[in-house]
Amino acid sequence: MKYLTLKIILSFILIIGISFASFAGKKKVLVSSSEPDAAIYSNGIKVGIGQAEIIVLSKSCVTINIRKVGYLEIEETICNKKGFPKPPKTKYYEMITDPAYDASIQTDMANTDIEVELNSDRTEVESWKILNQIITSYFDVIEISDRETGYLRTAWNLQTFDNASIRTRMIVKIGTLQPLSYKVKLVSEIAGPATSVKSDHLFSEWDRVLRTYETVIGQITSRLK
């Protein structure tokens, strides 16, 4: 029993000694960003906005992340141990705008069925023709176009950026028969850079739409009514 107690005490002293040594050799790094409202994280924990003091314990490393919507995320690991550069006293990060974000707009019309009631003074054939004309001015390839069932689907249009791949397509289907209406959906999805347009499992819905397509829903709505 005495041996067990002594062992526990020695282990506790050892832990305290190691912790003290780590804190004794700690380094402080004042991190700042070009964007004053960017969030700064240290090992996944938010530690400041725009500027923060990062503690790097002896014989350890810290991963710094800086994030702001519309900008590329910054990530860097700073180590305070042998074989690595000495942690700087200050570290300034210049954030770069996100090219995919700049080339797009946020909209509640993305990935949503928008019902468009057709003008009763126009025949269904005329409305279908107008619909196709509008869509083909934005999309080069239509995979399926069936007026009888009121279904149309374009092929994916892919646009790549340094940090992301964006694919966009249009889907049209019958909404109601009396009065006749179509449901129009602009599908917008995002994946990592250099992703094949066919890699469905790597894409997810995006609440933004590339500026190239920002007026397509409005055109369909205004010209078919």
Predicted regions and their residues:
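Glycine- and small/acidic-residue-enriched microsegments that form turns, hinges, and capping elements
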Residues: S34-D37, K68
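Boundary at the C-terminal end of the N-terminal hydrophobic targeting segment
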Residues: A21-K26
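A short, amphipathic beta-strand motif
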Residues: K27-S33
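Short beta-strand segments within Ig-like beta-sandwich modules, predominantly Fibronectin type-III
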Residues: G44-I49
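Bacterial N-terminal signal peptides that target proteins for export
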Residues: M1-L10
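Bacterial N-terminal signal peptides
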Residues: I9-S19
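Ser/Thr-rich, low-complexity intrinsically disordered terminal regions
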Residues: G50-K225
